[in-house]
Amino acid sequence: MTFCSLERVVMILVEDLTIVSQREIAPRIFEMVLKGEMVADMQVGQFVHLKVPDPSKLLRRPISISEIDYDKKEATIVYRVEREGTAILSKMVAGQTIDTMVPQGNGFDISVVDAGEKALLIGGGIGVPPLVETAKQLKAKGVEVISVIGFANKDAVILEDKLRACGDVYVTTDDGSYGIKGYVSTVIDGFDWTPDAVYSCGAPGMLKYVDSKFENH
């Protein structure tokens, strides 16, 4: 079993990407589609750094890449509105451009798992988006994909349909309002099989559990 972080030496690029569309997919959760040449340099599991179009906002916002369409040169990002900076991003519309820096993060190495093997994808909350493109590319190479995703409640559940298009999906909610009541650990601790590769993104507590659960495999 392999944990899959991909380290590479890359050149950081900055480009004004064009917003193709934006919509709210859950309360305070937005999905934005961006278009531009630098999409060709994006990899699964990475994120973009967006410059908020407001001179008072000096720091870029890191946003996970959810899907990549290399043919259309489009990338989908998903983010949660937390404070003023992301609130400004949520008001942007199709046709506007946004200063974008990529690639950011090591990403996931999908080369370590082969056709016919099993990959376990584990995500919590806003950590779920980068698993979507990961699942799509793994499925395309013949890997069996099993996803376990956890949320606070039914209203917070996102991207379940896109992950189901790639394989089996288990959904947990803290309050039991949707799917299985509990946490991702509730499901994973009941598995009687061992994955060949694990890809995970979420809160520190969840990642600590994943490290502990699979450290001896």
What are these regions (language model features)?
Residues 2-10:
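Short, Lys/Arg-enriched N-terminal segments with co-localized hydrophobic residues
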Residues 84-217:
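FNR/FR-type flavoprotein reductase catalytic core
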Residues 9-13, 200:
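Extended hydrophobic/aromatic-rich secondary-structure runs
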Residues 1-3, 53, 101:
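Selective for proline/serine-rich intrinsically disordered segments
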